[in-house]
């Protein structure tokens, strides 16, 4: 069943519409809505941060239903796809019975969201050969800067031996940008122009722990560049461990994100990185794309500063924000 708020005809007794609502009445309705939402937010924060403070009160079924509809609206306002909201709320329907507290309902929604996101899948270094990490994605999402942030962590924080390869020869600025980062980190950089050059470039860095490969950003509508990217990924020798990270912007429209994901559907086992979280207040697309692609989210970025403005995806933090928690 859908948990979307019912229409007025379904939820309210018919009453004559006033010719002109009084300002005081309108203000009262708004204030009441604010109070309800604030009450929900406070209870959410209490549930997340202090789950054992006190025994929760037992609501009536009407309160439960209203609470679920507020949860529905909160997720919808965060741009979670309606079909995913209904799937989650369908699963917790069994908890909507007398005697269950609002905390129980909220806790189950919270857990369902946590399970759907799963755990972050970050870059692992565990072999004798270098791990070759490809970063792919559309133009303008901050792919090269993201590479620099992660590479800086491996070099400075984890004391790993790293190298750069760029196959992004469509944009001179991208190569220059990565070369600047390579110079700052005192890290070697190779530029390749075709997929056939990849293995010889990787072989030059046999002593590296991680080799970061920057690829050309392109429109998902550009079939030629898509084929070039596929050839590059397929061209790596199987003796090397490979990881692929699809970099997406959290500010991109949902419909466009779906088209981008569809254009990468023939790539096996890629992970997701979302950039520009600082430029949006709605995080629903992170859940939407995770569920649509079935790819794990690894990192998120929240600014331009290298290497600071990146972190491993924090599932609990994002879920709290999706449920109306304060950032």
Task: Give residue ranges: language-model regions.
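Non-catalytic terminal/linker segments enriched in charged/polar, low-complexity residues
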Residues: 1-116, 121
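Phosphate-binding P-loop
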Residues: 123-130
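Hydrophobic anchor at the beta1->P-loop junction of P-loop NTPases
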Residues: 133-135
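Walker A (P-loop) phosphate-binding loop of P-loop NTPases
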Residues: 140
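Conserved lysine of the Walker
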Residues: 143
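Hydrophobic positions on the alpha1 helix immediately C-terminal to the Walker A/P-loop
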Residues: 146, 150, 177
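Short beta-strand-centered segment that lines the nucleotide-binding/catalytic pocket of NTP-utilizing
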Residues: 157-173, 191-196, 301-302
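Conserved catalytic-core segment of NTP-binding enzymes
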Residues: 177, 184, 194-204, 210, ...
């Amino acid at each position: 069943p859908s948990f979307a708020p019912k229409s007025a005809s379904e939820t309210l007794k018919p009453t004559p519409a006033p010719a002109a609502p009084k300002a005081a009445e309108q203000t009262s309705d708004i204030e009441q809505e604010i109070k309800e939402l604030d009450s929900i937010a406070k209870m959410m924060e209490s549930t997340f941060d202090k789950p054992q403070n006190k025994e929760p009160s037992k609501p009536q079924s009407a309160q439960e239903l209203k609470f679920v509809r507020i949860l529905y609206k909160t997720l919808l306002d965060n741009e979670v796809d309606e079909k995913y909201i209904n799937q989650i709320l369908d699963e917790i329907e069994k908890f909507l019975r007398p005697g269950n507290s609002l905390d129980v309902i909220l806790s189950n929604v919270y857990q369902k969201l946590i399970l759907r996101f799963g755990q972050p899948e970050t870059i692992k270094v565990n072999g004798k050969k270098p791990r070759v990490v490809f970063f792919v994605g559309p133009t303008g999402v901050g792919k090269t800067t993201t590479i620099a942030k992660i590479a800086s962590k491996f070099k400075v924080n984890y004391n790993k031996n790293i190298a750069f390869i760029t196959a992004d020869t469509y944009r001179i600025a991208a190569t220059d940008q990565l070369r600047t980062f390579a110079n700052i980190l005192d890290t070697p950089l190779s530029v390749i122009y075709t997929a056939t050059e990849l293995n010889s470039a990787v072989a030059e860095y046999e002593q590296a722990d991680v080799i970061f490969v920057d690829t050309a950003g392109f429109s998902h509508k550009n079939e030629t560049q898509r084929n070039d990217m596929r050839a590059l990924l397929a061209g790596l020798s199987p003796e090397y461990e490979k990881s692929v990270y699809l970099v997406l912007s959290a500010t991109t429209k949902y419909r466009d994100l779906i088209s981008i994901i569809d254009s990468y559907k023939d790539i096996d086992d890629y992970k997701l990185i979302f950039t520009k979280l600082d430029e949006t207040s709605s995080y629903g697309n992170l859940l939407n794309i995770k569920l649509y692609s079935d790819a794990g989210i690894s990192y998120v970025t929240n600014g331009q500063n290298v290497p600071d403005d990146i972190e491993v995806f924090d599932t609990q933090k994002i879920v709290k924000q999706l449920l109306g928690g304060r950032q």
